Amino acid sequence: GRGGPSNYVRL
């Protein structure tokens, strides 16, 4: 995903 690790989990 975009923005960082927390957003990457949500994809």
From Swiss-Prot:
Record bears the keyword Secreted: yes
Compartment list: Secreted
UniProt-listed GO biological process terms: neuropeptide signaling pathway
Key words, A-Z: Amidation, Neuropeptide, Secreted
Entry superkingdom: Eukaryota
Family per similarity comment: Belongs to the FARP (FMRF amide related peptide) family.
Biological role stated in the UniProt entry: FMRFamides and FMRFamide-like peptides are neuropeptides.
UniProt-recorded name of the protein: Extended FMRFamide-9
